[in-house]
Structures are given as structure tokens and as C-alpha cells.
Amino acid sequence: MNSVGSPLLWGSFAVLITIMLLLDLSLQGRKKEQAMSFRQAAVWSVIWVSLSLLFALGLWWYCRETVGVAVANSQVMAFLTGYLLEKALAVDNVFVWLMLFSYFAIPANLQRRVLIYGVLGAIVLRTVMIFAGSWLVSQFSWILYLFGLFLLVTGVKMALVKEDDSPIGDKPFVRWLKAHIRITDNLHGERFFVKEKGLLYATPLILVLILVEISDVIFAVDSIPAIFAVTTDPFIVLTSNLFAILGLRAMYFLLAGVAEKFTMLKYGLSVILAFIGIKMLIIDFYHIPIGGSLGAVASILAVTMIINVWVNKYKATENQ
């Protein structure tokens, strides 16, 4: 499979991500007893977004010098589209985390610890999923049609099917975990495991971490095929995806207090998924350029946010 990713680009990306992760973990480790404040979350969100844009600029410059301006423009638009897609779809992931932390009564200072390991695990799992997906696409090009159909069905289902409101503790997988793993009734600070009466017990914190990882894999099943609709270049797919999820922890603490106000978001995301699915299904008849995909995704998100603001204002007026 043709890829813009040269050893220099792969190496630069790996070094940059490693340095930023170590810096982030080092700074957060000094404040492990504190919850991330809204201000800290905002600062880190700006840092991660700025770093992503700087990477896009560096990618454009490198491609311009090596393969020409046209390819540079195309690759950067693909990166930005993938990044925006992942950021948008990740908001739903944030809502699931909020429900998990609320159900298991995890305090904010311990949420930070869970999300640190959660994001690190997501990096590993998504890397494996993306390379597996790239291999499948390179071997079986028709699989893109399956991705497209899956995204179209998922988009329609997201808009029309009512969400499952049953308690998290009643979910089959949670019941299975509790039946097969010794879990303490109470939290033990930041510890994932404790010994009681000579036996090793898991704390509720490790249960939440497992569920956080599972939720990320479930959402990745939607987001990764969506990015393959934009580009099949594994370098662009991986870098756009990882840059988006690296800022996910900061996004969580940024949105935690206002999550209930995003009532219309799922409809916007459903339209995006349906659009991407249709784009993949009609690829042989009509090719939507990358710039068109980027514009469509950005426009759908913008319209969704405007409608969301209007709905919230209307509800506030009705409640007065």
C-alpha cells in the first residue's frame, strides 16, 4: 500500500508522541492527589490541538519538498479530516466515561489516574486495529464497502434507536466480571489491586479501567472505518487518530460539567457517519474529494452546535 510515511516521518512522530506523553505523565504525576481543574484541562486541550496543527504543518512542508504541493495539500486535508472526525466521535466516548465514573462513584482525583492508563491502553489497541485494518484494506479492497455499509447502518441506528438506560451494573459483561473476579466493595485510593486475608482482590478502580478500555474499542470500531473512508494511508490514519485521542483526557475534564447540554450531538454524529458511509459506498460512481469531506464534516458539526445552542436557550426560556 502506498504511504507518505517515510522512516523519517514515522520516527519523528514516535519521538514527538513519546516526549509529550512523558511530559504529560510527569506533570500529572506531581499532582496525582488533585483533580484536573477546568483551567488545566483547557490549557492541555489547547496544547494538544496546537501540537496537532504544528504536526500537520510539518507534514505539509515535508510532502511539499519530497512529492510536491498537490500531494502535500491532499495529505494534510486527509489528516485534518481524520483528526476532526475522531475528535467529534470521541465526545460520545466522554459521555460514556461520565456514566461509568458516576455509577461507580469514582472521585475526580482518581478519574485522572484511570484515564491516564485508559489513554495509554487506547494508543496500543488503536495502533493494532489500524494496522490490521490497513492490511485488510490492502488485501481485500471490497472491505471498504462493508465499512461503508456498517457506518451507514450505525449512523441511522444512532439517530433512531433509543439508548439503553439500564444501570451499568446490570450489563451482562459487568455481571460476568463481578462473578469471576474478586472485587472489593470499596475503593482503596489509587490502588487497582489489594490483598485481603491473603487473597488478591481487584478494586472497583480496575473494573472501571477495563470498562473504559472496552468503551474505547467499541467507539474505535466506528471511528477507524470512518477515517479509512478519507484515506487508506496507514500513516495518516494512525497519526490523525492518535493525535485526537491524546487530548481525550483533557477533553473529558473540559466537558464533564457541561455534558448534559450536548443533547443534539448524537444527531450530528449520526449524519456524519451516514455521510461517510455513503461516500464509501458510491466511491466507484462518484468520488467526493478530501476537501469536500473536510468541509462537510466541519459544516455538520457547526450546524449541530448552533442547533444545540438554540435548543438549550429554548429549554431555558420554557423553564422560566
Swiss-Prot record:
What keywords tag this UniProt record?
A: Cell inner membrane, Cell membrane, Membrane, Transmembrane, Transmembrane helix
Question: What is this protein's name?
Answer: Putative membrane-bound redox modulator Alx
Which purpose does this protein serve, as stated in its record?
Answer: Has been proposed to be a redox modulator.
Instruction: Please state the span of the N-terminal signal peptide per the UniProt entry.
Output: none
Task: Output the Pfam families linked to this UniProt entry.
Answer: TerC (PF03741)
Q: Where in the cell is it found?
A: Cell inner membrane
UniProt topology in membrane: Multi-pass membrane protein
One cellular-component annotation, GO: plasma membrane
Family listed: Belongs to the TerC family.
- Keyword Membrane among record annotations: yes
The gene designation is: alx
Q: Which positions, given as ranges, span the membrane?
A: 3-23, 41-61, 88-108, 114-134, 136-156, 199-219, 226-246, 271-291, 292-312
